[in-house]
Amino acid sequence: MSFLLVEPDLVTAAAANLAGIRSALSEAAAAASTPTTALASAGADEVSAAVSRLFGAYGQQFQALNARAATFHAEFVSLLNGGAAAYTGAEAASVSSMQALLDAVNAPTQTLLGRPLIGNGADGVAGTGSNAGGNGGPGGILYGNGGNGGAGGNGGAAGLIGNGGAGGAGGAGGAGGAGGAGGTGGLLYGNGGAGGNGGSAAAAGGAGGNALLFGNGGNGGSGASGGAAGHAGTIFGNGGNAGAGSGLAGADGGLFGNGGDGGSSTSKAGGAGGNALFGNGGDGGSSTVAAGGAGGNTLVGNGGAGGAGGTSGLTGSGVAGGAGGSVGLWGSGGAGGDGGAATSLLGVGMNAGAGGAGGNAGLLYGNGGAGGAGGNGGDTTVPLFDSGVGGAGGAGGNASLFGNGGTGGVGGKGGTSSDLASATSGAGGAGGAGGVGGLLYGNGGNGGAGGIGGAAINILANAGAGGAGGAAGSSFIGNGGNGGAGGAGGAAALFSSGVGGAGGSGGTALLLGSGGAGGNGGTGGANSGSLFASPGGTGGAGGHGGAGGLIWGNGGAGGNGGNGGTTADGALEGGTGGIGGTGGSAIAFGNGGQGGAGGTGGDHSGGNGIGGKGGASGNGGNAGQVFGDGGTGGTGGAGGAGSGTKAGGTGSDGGHGGNATLIGNGGDGGAGGAGGAGSPAGAPGNGGTGGTGGVLFGQSGSSGPPGAAALAFPSLSSSVPILGPYEDLIANTVANLASIGNTWLADPAPFLQQYLANQFGYGQLTLTALTDATRDFAIGLAGIPPSLQSALQALAAGDVSGAVTDVLGAVVKVFVSGVDASDLSNILLLGPVGDLFPILSIPGAMSQNFTNVVMTVTDTTIAFSIDTTNLTGVMTFGLPLAMTLNAVGSPITTAIAFAESTTAFVSAVQAGNLQAAAAALVGAPANVANGFLNGEARLPLALPTSATGGIPVTVEVPVGGILAPLQPFQATAVIPVIGPVTVTLEGTPAGGIVPALVNYAPTQLAQAIAP
């Protein structure tokens, strides 16, 4: 069956255009008639007369043909006009008959039920002033939207397909009327209508209409008590948002859809965000007087953000922000809401609200949500009362299997004391703790920074301490987070300045990964007072570095101590610098973290005053029990500068270096802090002691300047009187083992890492494809009701073809929504089917990886090239050939060492030097063992000139003992005129079999399966 679509207006326009063309042609033919049909003869002779008659006959024939064409043209234009009129009439008759049929169909239901079968409901009466309007009429039972309500009237409900009508806004007269409720959406498809807004600030908003199967819930209207949110369709749809002012929860999403946002409020807590299954949770509502609403939770998607807290109208205290929504399976947690700021009650500053905790991530994948910031504390203006404390930052959310922990929230600022207040300004809020990283992989979250302590504006008040930085989150496989920085202490005008907040501890890595760095301490508060003013505030201590993982990982660096607060003329002395944090220790393999530097003592400016003492430095972390270097000790804090005839501050000692255990060097001691300038200058600190070296191998760390000589751990070469060959054997063996270990620590188990990364990538690709396909399938299903609605409209207009097209298109789009042909070489299907296509690539990728591994382990090719112009070259071997070369190196170096020892013994005997002969004989076992383990040699291999372009080339093949490091090949080419030139060849290295097995081969296999 075929269909013909005709637009009558276009046919009529075409006929008019053709008539215009015919008119122009007729005028041209008339103008040419006389000159071409009656030609005058050029002469009186017979030839001229014959020529005139001939061409005149041509003109007459043209006019005859033109007349016939004009007749045909007129008939064709008439037919076009007639066809257009016929189509127009048929269309009008069809519409008329369809309208008559529609009226006949609607009549029974309109009479019995007061609503049509197909059609929109009537809008409610508008209403005037304080007089409420009418409710919107219901939509058609099969199809139609509900009518909108008049002033304060409810929206009409839809039938099977259609949207609910919007509730009318409340009337503005008098106290203002409540908004009307939104109408319910269609049973099969349709959105709920929006609730009407209240007519005044004191009036209630209307509730949003509900959806049933497919459709979004209506939003509640705003008002003094806003309207409730409409429910989403059961299968697909977003939950409605609760009305502003309601403090009600947002509606939950359908099976596929987002939760609605909670309503804000000025009289109670903010509403919670709606929950979801496959979609994002709704955001919590904010409140100006109470706690913020919690963010909505979800199964697959992102959690909603928590709402901001407000300020209590009764007490002036800040109220906590809402917690971020958590995720069940896949997705990131929502951010916590900010805590509310505090004000004062009868002049007394109140405490601020804490930030909301970040939501936890999904079980399979996702990052924890960030914690909300704490609010600022209230200021105090009356005597004897403290100012408000800043709110603590919210904790970051935790990850589950894969993902990073959330960052902790920033602490709020402490309140100030002003006027005649004589108590203490508020302390800054503590930073929130970072979230824990994923169990299988992920980094811990960073701790939040502490808040600034409140300043003491009046001379009788004490300044507030800075808030402590948040502790960082730990990790299982991954790096621990960094600790939050401590907040600066508040400044004072005479009495005590605020102490700087301590930095948060770095996060610990539990299995594999490095510990996080500790946060820096906050700066001590300055004191601007003059005579008899208190010292500047002490700087905050730096946070300790986190420990490295049980199997591998470096300890985190300790945080630096905060600088001491400065003082003005007449004050006692500058503030003492904060203590540096201790570096984190490694457990089995890894280096200890560097100790944090001590804070600089505060300077004294103007008049006579003593500079502050430098803060003590942190010690370096200890190395892993098996292998690793100890951390360097922190630098001692420098003393602050004195003024006038007063002394500068004393510098502190440098931190001790961390110790090694079995293999590794001790950490160097930190440098002592410089003494502060003054009269006299402050004494400098001593350098820290270096850490002890490993028992099997390692040197003790150097003492930091300007300290005494390092207390060196006795090494084997200095404490055990053995012969040189045995010393070389032990030193070379330990050095090569250390090199192998360091290379492995830099990239442990690369093949296993790449394999696990591939599997995780396949899993993520599969879950993403299934999630996208499920979402697009639901979107396609949701598109069927609107298409049916469009098809009904087309049928009502007599357009059967359009109706069929709408229905078929909707069914197809459930599976394929379109085609992406932007790249003709890679045309892609869109929609659920196209979403699933990437999964089909996984078996091929796995098969290709297996093939690549097989090809790598069976590759016996050798490739060589040299560019004598640019002095570059490449020498590559297949993996089995490279491993064979590495395996045969040890027998060669052993034989060389045996031959050298034999030659030395024979030469000494022949020379009559019995002492040298005895030494060669005693040292021979060590030399042979050293050759077997650590020997290195290069074997010359002359290449045929036919393979080198006629230039003589000799390749030096590196061979080594089983522990010898891998070395590149070298080639020497004898270039005419220039002479011999040595080129280091890129490509495959060669050496000991152990580093080849531990480091080189796994790297080659990892590259074989890398995407």
Swiss-Prot record:
Classification via SUPFAM superfamilies: PE/PPE dimer-like
Consequences of knocking out this gene: Deletion mutant is attenuated in vivo during murine tuberculosis, specifically during the chronic steps of infection. On day 28 post infection, shows a slight reduction of the bacterial burden. On day 70, shows a strong reduction of the bacterial burden. Mice infected with the mutant show smaller, non-confluent tubercules. Mutant shows impaired ability to survive and multiply within murine macrophages. It is unable to inhibit phago-lysosome fusion in THP-1 cells.
Gly residues composition-biased segments: 595-696
UniProt KW keywords: Cell wall, Secreted, Virulence
Region (PGRS domain): 130-696
Compartment annotation: Secreted, Cell wall; Cell surface
Misc: Infection of human THP-1 macrophages with M.smegmatis expressing PE_PGRS30 results in reduced production of IL-12, TNF-alpha and IL-6, as compared to infection with vector control M.smegmatis. No differential effects are observed on bacterial persistence inside macrophages or on macrophage mortality upon infection. However, expression of this gene in M.smegmatis is sufficient to enhance the ability to persist intracellularly and induce murine J774 macrophages death. Differential response of the human and murine macrophages could be due to cell-specific processes.
Protein's recorded name: PE-PGRS family protein PE_PGRS30
Organism field: Mycobacterium tuberculosis (strain ATCC 25618 / H37Rv)
